[in-house]
Amino acid sequence: MEAEEADVDVEGDVAAAAQPGNDESTASVFQDHYLDSTWRRENGCLPWTLDSTISDENRAIIEKMLLEEEYYLSNKSLPGKFWVNQKEDNKKYTNSLQKSSKAMVDSPAKPASHSVKWTVEEKELFEQGLAKFGRRWTKIATLLKSRTVLQVKSYARQYFKNKVKWDVEKETPTQKSSSDLQVKNKDDRTKAWAAACLRGSADPCLNAVKIEKLSDDEDVDITDELDELTSQTSQNSGSHLTLDVPNSKMYTTNQGELCQEGPLAKSSGESLQNVKQGEGEACSSSEIASWAEKQKSTDKNSAELNEKYNKVVEEHTLHRGEVREEAKHSPSPEPCERQDSSGNEMLLPPCQIEEENHEGEELKPPEQEVEIDRNVIQEEEKQAIPEFFEGRQTKTPERYLKIRNYILDQWEICKPKYLNKTSVRPGLKNCGDVNCIGRIHTYLELIGAINFGCEQAVYNRPQPLDKVRAADRKDAEAAYQLAWRLQSMRTRRRRVRDPWGNWCDAKDLEGQTFEHLSVEEMARRKEEEKCKPIKFSKASKLPKSSLDPFQLIPCNFFSEEKQEPFQVKVAAEALLIMNLHAHVSMAEVIGLLGGRYSEADKVLEVCAAEPCNSLSTGLQCEMDPVSQTQASETLALRGYSVIGWYHSHPAFDPNPSLRDIDTQAKYQSYFSRGGAKFIGMIVSPYNRSNPLPYSQITCLVISEEVSPDGTYRLPYKFEVQQMLEEPQWELVFEKTRWIIEKYRLSNSSVPMDRIFRRDSDLTCLQKLLECLRKTLSKVANCFIAEEFLTQIENLFLSNYKSKEENGLAEEDSTKELFM
């Protein structure tokens, strides 16, 4: 940490005594250590000070230049600003020879040219706030009113560093000796001289105050601590550090200065300043030698002085090891008393005490589930989640009730399954940030209101083994400490976005891909499977690797024994877009379904379909993540929620494959945690086993039932009802243009002017129009429907790729597909 500290001279520029004969000159503020000796004459005057033609302005500029050079050459940081003009009508020094200097980095919220000393009332209020609120600086600043949060934080830092308890000194009197750092000087005159030397000396080593590097938004307040320490030196012996020199003698130099033999003059000033920053280091021998070297230039008896100081240096070197050993036992800033196992009191640093306070007492899992009155907010809740009860406009008690009750409702729905934070967020939009929702969720879990009896519930975080355990604290308000531990209790998990753009746990999406086999690969694989049947031993279970993920599984039908969990109604607009999208590609296409779910009526309405881009590898295809996110946002802008997905089986049955079942089951589980529903729809436009020109559509969900061989969960098919609302014609035209532009140049595009099967006279385009006509027959006037179909036909004829442009290769592949 020492490398991060900087010595800031807060007195050197104004604290020097005036040169003889130049009391009024501004040059008198500079001491020998600021200028090289070659620039001085024998009488101590600077050459440029003798020139009376230099104006005051130029003289001030020269002084500033020399001061800057000294700071740069000595590797010191320049002050924020320093006054060089001595005109009383313009500027005045903020520090004088009779007052110790003060430095303050002001907060932007409270600008001031100088720092304001803390009053007795402010200090008393600070201590009251500290006892009441602890280390919550915002609360204490609100109590003070006259101080900002940063100023309170800065004062607290100095307050804790200079706080030394009397009872600690009383209990350890036998540990004090003449070699300790905390010793008292026997001579009152010597101590008074040391305090005066602290103020009057211009030695930068004496006037250096070590300041820890802080962030840009923190105040550094060193205004009144130094004054208090020097003024209370003779009264509060526990508030400063001095070095005891038992046989110290006083001597007078030829210039009449009162000095002390030994390192007291040096160590006294440093000790008083080191108390300010909480340091207990003894002055080194190099610092004493440096001080003697500077006295040599002004003292005629330098030989005698050096001889005496060399003796002191030797003695100091001999005892330095002992002093450092004693320094290890010196009390640290803000000592906290603690008793060890033997009953002896021990001192621990404040950072350790603070960490142990945060660990707190281990919470016990609730013994029984807690029932909470939905209309009442208990006092414990206000203590644990105080942010909703502090008068904020965005966080009100009503909003807290809404969030809490919604979480409790979701727990009742999913009980006994674990209710995580992610699953409750979709139903709490515009109710605050995810962190405050998470804190309420964790609080309810800790008290046993939700997730009671679930293995995933975490009530205590693991404690490091090498931590020093604090003694058990029996506090009446221990129950209210939950609020400080809400977010730190549970181990953080990696968060990722699901295909719909929502944040979720990474484990929720493991193994989920939208992959489907092309028609050619499906036929080839089936032939291979017939030629090479797989033989399993009777005792062995079906290996997972032997399962064909593209095997189609017929759907079961709901019955009286197993009724539909809800009804499914599909709007004409969604049917039109799904048919348009599925008819133009020999490869599978994918999209999202948007709509709404009515919990009261148990009805799921599919109001819109949003086509998405798909990525194909020849054997399988999956939805483009970017396109999925855009589609989800588009549905949200229209006021719809994502309630399902659709894809096509171009030339085979609209039954789900094993991979479709796995994907649908995972998304059902994910959306059901938040109370939402999620369905899957499969469109088969060119199924060879279907003699009719209409597409086959399957709407399904995956049940909890498992197949007889235990390899997959059983899919169930809904009886879909069509809604009687007219589609938004312009929106359908817009989607049609996008589909045509997307697939007209695609290698997998279907030639719409070709006969779609041998025993039919309809082209693919005419077949598409027949499907659309059947959909519109229930919702629109026949004239409006025919006009719409005519415009769709014109769009394909004018913009879609023709058979000749496709090439012979694609024509052959099309024949193989449809014939």
From Swiss-Prot:
Q: How does the entry describe the domains? A: Contains an N-terminal SANT domain that mediates histone/DNA binding, a central SWIRM domain to mediate interaction with chromatin associated proteins, and a C-terminal MPN domain that contains the metalloprotease activity.
Question: What protein name does the entry list?
Answer: Deubiquitinase MYSM1
Write out the entry's keywords from A to Z.
Activator, Chromatin regulator, Cytoplasm, DNA-binding, Hydrolase, Immunity, Isopeptide bond, Metal-binding, Metalloprotease, Nucleus, Phosphoprotein, Protease, Transcription, Transcription regulation, Ubl conjugation, Ubl conjugation pathway, Zinc
Q: How does gene deletion manifest?
A: Deficient mice elicit hyper-inflammatory responses, are more susceptible to septic shock, more resistant to RNA virus replication but exhibit early death upon DNA viral infection. They also show an impaired B-cell development. In a similar way, NK-cell and dendritic cell development is impaired in deletion mutant. An enhanced systemic inflammation can be observed characterized by higher cytokine levels, as well as the hepatocellular enzyme alanine aminotransferase, a marker of liver damage.
Note the Pfam families from the entry: JAB (PF01398), Myb_DNA-binding (PF00249), SWIRM (PF04433)
User: Which parts of this chain are annotated as the region Disordered?
Assistant: 1-29, 228-247, 260-279, 318-347
Q: What does this gene product do?
A: Metalloprotease with deubiquitinase activity that plays important regulator roles in hematopoietic stem cell function, blood cell production and immune response. Participates in the normal programming of B-cell responses to antigen after the maturation process. Within the cytoplasm, plays critical roles in the repression of innate immunity and autoimmunity. Removes 'Lys-63'-linked polyubiquitins from TRAF3 and TRAF6 complexes. Attenuates NOD2-mediated inflammation and tissue injury by promoting 'Lys-63'-linked deubiquitination of RIPK2 component.
UniProt source species: Mus musculus
Does the keyword field hold Ribosomal protein? Answer: no
Domain (SANT) spans 113-164
